[in-house]
Structures are given as structure tokens and as C-alpha cells.
Amino acid sequence: MAQYTPMIQQYLKVKADYKDAFLFFRLGDFYEMFFEDAVKAAHELEITLTSRDGGSSERIPMCGVPYHAAQNYIEQLIEKGYKVAICEQVEDPKTAKGVVRREVVQLITPGTMMEGRTIDEKENNFLAALTRFEDGSYALACNDLTTGQNTVTLLTGSVEDVLLEVYATGSKEIVVDSTFSQDELNKLTETLKMTVSYEEETKIPEGLEPLVKKVTQTKLVTAVGRLFNYVLRTQKRSLDHLQPVEIYYTNQFMKIDVHSKRNLELTETLRTKEKTGSLLWLLDKTKTAMGGRMLKQWMERPLIQKEKIEERLEMVETFVNDYFLREDLKEKLKEVYDLERLAGKVAYGSVNARDLLQLKRSLQQVPAILEAISLLDNSYAAKLIEGADPCEALTKLLDRSIQENPPLSVKDGDIIKDGYNEKLDEYRYISKNGKTWIAELEKREREITGIKSLKIGYNRIFGYYIEVTKANLSLLPEGRYERKQTLANAERFITDELKEKETLILEAEEKIVQLEYDLFTALREEVKVFIPKLQHLAKVISELDVLQSFATVSEEERFVKPVLTNKREIFIKDGRHPVVEKVLDGKLYVPNDCMMPENMDVFLITGPNMSGKSTYMRQLALVTIMAQIGCFVPATEAILPVFDQIFTRIGAADDLISGQSTFMVEMLEAKNAIANASERSLILFDEIGRGTSTYDGMALAQAIIEHIHDQIGAKTLFSTHYHELTVLEESLTHLKNVHVSAIEEDGKVVFLHKIQEGAADKSYGIHVAQLAELPDSLIARAKEVLAQLEGQEEITIPKRTEVKEQPERMQQPVIEEQPVIKEVAEVQQESEEIVEESQLSFFETEERMEKQEKPVLDAKETAVLAQIKKIDLLDMTPLEALNELYRLQKKLKKG
């Protein structure tokens, strides 16, 4: 390092402490980066990479960003999961001896961003800290630095359960210790897409002990200690807005695993990963940012305590029944800014005058809101607003101190109102009168000299001056004007009188700016005292906002208040999928009942694709979740039990466990339900077993149904294409067949989307293929083959005389499919021994088949033909079909 210049040595010394972050090194008006940081930053930010002399034989890579535009570049790096250390000059370069002293004043990470475009106003920005203990348990602590919220929980399940809970927090960054293995870290970084950071210290930092007063378990305190130490180490400033740690237990809420949340599209859609089209999108009628965040938290964790759910429902009913109260509340909430994050900015020291003006305007709405709620005859409302302080003293303080239209910067003056501070008023009087005197002097000088173009101006370098054009210089009295500056076409002068006033005016203006900044800083400290009250008030306002949102959407969409029962029965009359109905936008939506009395546990659902089976299943789950977060539900009547968990297997494979086949994912999710579901759970399985061969899939599907029916007793909707399973209704007393109805008109199928009792009699697979616009010739041939199969006729083909040349890619051997290819080859070899006319084919002409005589079949052949009739060819791959053909041929040959 000795060969480098002192400044580069300083850079390297600081960088050594922040190896995993980009070091923004302040040099004048730029943040500079050097060495590997420069190369990588230039690529990520798409800025110019240059170099400089650093004292060594080779030039040092360098890039930089302007100080005033740094925030944009920092956000770009944070969005990509990087960290940025801000290294500032901490002494005046004018007074520095040698290299200016520099220190890192903040480490910005994905989990500690306070503001910017990466922060969604209606989402929390959680930082998580995970601690593992010798007994295999974990403690998970989370902090949202923007709001000060802190939570902690103990996790005793599997590693997968822990990862899913971490994922559920939505954290962008997780703090661990050095005992975590590389495999575990990979799951966090690659699977959960989180930035991993390290913190070994777990002792609660000095001054933050009051925040863990209610946390008595050592494990939980350890996790919180790790979290707090990391936050303090990265932020290096006051964190007075941190709230007391809240303990939560996962068994206090309905469990919905990540796969189910995705399949049900609770907060984002499966396809676009956006809010629009999700249940959250439909329910979000909140008027405040903090209300939007609370709504999402409620949706992530539905309640399972019947009394608490009913409290929310009663409050929603109050708002539904009182239109004028609800509309008045909404109008007031529109004027309420984000109290939580404003309080955070106050504590953080980043609040400006406009923020405080927003705070004042928000607080001005609070007394009327609290008064209106206090008049309600509702115990939940009374409990909700109990202890809420409208902070009227703070409102008055801000009203008499902050100008109505202050500048964005707190260092430009014009922030504090007249009358707030006597000294400031005095300086302002001098400044204002001084400027009036300047205007009068200009008028007087014009009269004395007779120069109409004479003017008095000001600039930062020369101060005040009298400017006269060169053509008029001869008109100036001698000895009165002192030359100050010469221009191309004019001369600038100063007089003793102007010099005296200039001193007074400039001193006053400098003192005004400095005094206003000092007064604002002091005001900010006064506001800090109110932070706990503001945070409590924010929770009250947020909850009221969510409840009015439920009431608003319930009235708009014709939802009804659900009745919760302790019995294990479901009674939903005219239930609807709320999002699908909304997207249809006025088009006819077909509602469906779901009646499952206490003695009915399983609905076995059959019916064609596109008929609405999956929608019906999702509909029940969404109705259940909506009820348990305290919202009305889309139905004309609803009686529901309180479910402890929801398990779903709907749609294609889309999970956190990368690299697994569709069938493996099905089995893992089935295992999750079988291992963890109780009789108070809801299970939704769509087409379980489709990812393997027909008989394997059918056998597994039947075994799973029987296990759920006999061993678990959970309310279950199980859809299937295996129509053979419908006979289970005869042996399983708590299972009932239902189907999605359809009718045929003029050879075309019409899906009625109506759930009816009994099993489906047809699959309508060919009709679905028609809707998918498969070629007409293919559809016609499929109908032909289907008719022959249903009539138990043989299907034969002529010997092929001409084969089209296959594309080159089809001729290449596929290593993975060699076993299957071998089976196909065996089929072909054995088929040569059979009479040519009896070979099976999908290409025999109708004329030739008519000429053939129907053979007399023995019992074995009749049984095989019956099996062929049941095969759903459209639900098999070509290779699966060939394997099935091979099996049937072997069976016939054994005869």
C-alpha cells in the first residue's frame, strides 16, 4: 500500500471494512469509486470507466457520479441487491492538514433503504435476522426501518417451514451468523432472492433495552439483538422511531404456504407477478399508504380466533350500514399522509419542512376522525381508539412555525413563519427594509446624476454595486463613486453609504438562513418527543382505513357478512370468485353453491377442462380467506367454520424448490398437506397424479383421497380426470361426487359452469380441442377414432408406402429417452409378426374399415378392449400412448 498516494491509501483503509459494498468515496462534488468497485459499478450503472494516477506504476480504474445525482445511482445498485457505503468528508478541506478526514456515515442495503423508488408506499421494507439454535429451532426477527416496526417469532418446524416463513415476510435482506453453510446461504440468495449479511453480536445494544421489555425468551432476545446490532452498525445515527418488539406466533394465524398464496393469487398474479388482477388489487380501497400496508399484512396472516374475526366483521358492518359516516371518513383519510414513515424521517434526521407541513395537515384531520368513531355504539371501535392522542399540541406547534409553502431544502431559508422567533423577525426587518432602502437609493442616484439607465445590482462575488454604462460615465460627480468592476460596456461602482447598508443587509440575510436552519433543527427535536404517539395514532388510522376499505368493496361488489360457526360445516349460497367476477366487468358470472355439512368432507369434482373446476376450488379458498381477515364475502349467504390451514395444489408447477418435476412437486405438496393438515383445514387438490402414468396416477389419487377421508377428515375439494374414481362414493361415506355441467348443441359443447351433484358422464376433450382451434382434419379424425373406441371396433391401418423425411433434429438420438425408445422398438419388432391388416393405427381410411369383418372376441380380448375404451388419449403424451399399447399387446399375447 505504501506505493499509493495518501488519498488512495485512505480509500483502501476504509474499503477494507466494507468489502461487500460499493464504496462511494466523496471527492469534492463527486462520489468516486476505484479498483474493482469502479469496474463493476461502470458496468452495472452504465457509466464511463476511466483511470487515474494513484502513485503506483499502473493507473487505477476509476468511475464517479455527481453528488447531487447520487441517490438515483444508489437506488439502481440497491435494486440489484448490492450494498453501498457512503464515505463523506468529515472536516473542512480549508482547515485540513494533509488528506481530508473521511468516514463512512451510512451503509445502505436492500433491507435498510429509507426512501426512494425501491420503497413501495403500500408495502413494508423488512430486514430479517435469522438465528439458529443447537436444538434445531430458529428465531426470526424483522425490522422495517421506514416505519420502526419490529417483530420476532420462534420457529420449530422443518428447514423448509423456516424458509417459507422468511419468504412470507417479504424481506429483501437477511442477517445471519457465520455458522450457516454455503448450501443454506444458496437457498437464501438463489431460491428466496435475498441479500445475505452477517452479524455476530447478539447482545441488545445500549439504549435499546426498553424495546425488548416484553420479550422474555432468551432465543427471541438473541435474534432481536442480532437485528438491532446490524441496524445500528449500518445506519450510524439516531433511531428513536424504533418501536417495541412485537412477539407473534405462527399458530395464531391461518397457515397458507407460499405455493398456495401463489396459486390463489392473493397479492400478485401468477403470470405477471403484479398486483393488478390479484385479490389484494380487488380489496384495496384504502386511502392511506399505511392502511395499504396493513391490508397486505392482514391478507398474509388471516386470523383463526373466531371472536377477533367477528369484531372486525361487526365494524365492517357498521361502515356498510352508515354510508355518510363511511364517505366522510374516506374524505378525511385522503388528507392523511404516511404518519409512520414521517415519524421515521423525523427520527432519522431526513425530514424537511414540507414533510412537517404534511404532518400538520394530517393531524388536523385526526380530531374529527376520532370523534366520529367515538360516537359509534361498537365496543371494538371504542377499544380501537382508546389511548389515541390527536397530538393537538404538535399541530399547534407546526402551525405557528412552518411556512405554508416552504422550499425542499432546509438550508435555503424561508421555512419559519414570522412571529415564531424575535431575533429572526429582527433580521428579516433589516433585510426587508434594507432592500427597500436600496430601491430608494437607486431612484435618488438617477435623479442626482440624470442617468436614467443607472441601476443598483447584486451578485455573490462583488456584492451590491451601482452600474453605469460607459456612455454616461462623464455624468458622474467626481470623488463620490469608487470603481469596483469594469465590464465591456459599463463600469460598476460603490459608495460609502451603499457599502454600509450592504454589510447590514448581507449579514442579516446570512444570519436569517443560519438561524432558520438552527430553529428547524430544534423544531425537529421537539417533534421527536411525539413519535410514540404518532406511531400509535398511525395504527389506529391504518386499521380504520382497512375496515372502511372492506366496507366499500363489500357494498360495491354485493358481498355479504359471513356467519362463523364452531361446527365443521360449509354453507355458501351463490358463491362467486371475486376477482374473476370483477374482471368479467358486467358480463354474466355463474355463481355456485358449496354445501358441505358436518358429515361431508370430500367433494370429488369431475368435468371437462375449461369448465370452471379450478375457479370453483379457488373460489372457496378466497371466500374463506376473506372471511378470516374480517371482510364480507362474495355470496348471497355464507356460513363457514374457521380453518386453521389451507393447502392447495392447483395449476402448473411453480414453486420455490427449483429443479423438481411437475409430478415431484405434486407429491411434495400432497405430502405437506397429508403431514400437516387437521380436520380444521381446507385442502384443494386439482388433478393430482397427472404427472405420471395413468395407472400410477389413478392409484395415488385414490390412496390420497382415502387417506384424507379416513385419517384426516379435512374439508377437501378434489378434482380429477380419472372418472373411475367416482365409484369411491359407494365406499367412502363422507365423499360426494359433483361435476361441472355442460350441454351439447348442434355438435358443439356449451359449458354451463354450474356445479351439480353426481359424476360427469363425458369429458368433452375433443370439444375443448376445438375451442383451442386445432386443425379441422385432426378434430374430425379424433371424433372418428372416439366413435370406433366407444363402439368397441378395431382400428387398423394400411402399410405405409411413403414416409416424409423427418427434420434433422427429430433424427438425432435423445439420450434421456433411450429406455422409452427401446420399448417402442420392441413394439415395432413384435408387431411385424401380426397380420398387417390388424395393426393399430390412427390413419386407416374409413372405406377400408367398413370392408373388414368384425372378429369374434374372447373374454381376455373383450377385457382389453374395455380398457382401451377408457383410455383418455388426449390426456396422454405420444410416448405414454405407445407404452400403454405395448402393455396391452403383451397382455393379449399371454393368452
Swiss-Prot record:
One of its GO terms (biological process) is mismatch repair. ATP binds at residues 607-614. SUPFAM superfamilies: DNA repair protein MutS, domain I, DNA repair protein MutS, domain II, DNA repair protein MutS, domain III, P-loop containing nucleoside triphosphate hydrolases. Pfam families: MutS_I, MutS_II, MutS_III, MutS_IV, MutS_V. CDD domains: ABC_MutS1. One of its GO terms (cellular component) is cytosol. One of its GO terms (molecular function) is damaged DNA binding. Keywords: ATP-binding, DNA damage, DNA repair, DNA-binding, Nucleotide-binding. It comes from the Bacteria. InterPro entries: DNA_mismatch_repair_MutS (IPR005748), DNA_mismatch_repair_MutS-lik_N (IPR007695), DNA_mismatch_repair_MutS/MSH (IPR017261), DNA_mismatch_repair_MutS_C (IPR000432), DNA_mismatch_repair_MutS_clamp (IPR007861), DNA_mismatch_repair_MutS_core (IPR007696), DNA_mismatch_repair_MutS_N (IPR016151), DNA_mismatch_repair_MutS_sf (IPR036187). NCBIfam families: mutS1 (TIGR01070), PRK05399.1 (NF003810). This protein is involved in the repair of mismatches in DNA. It is possible that it carries out the mismatch recognition step. This protein has a weak ATPase activity. Belongs to the DNA mismatch repair MutS family. This is DNA mismatch repair protein MutS. The lineage of its organism: Bacteria, Bacillati, Bacillota, Bacilli, Bacillales.
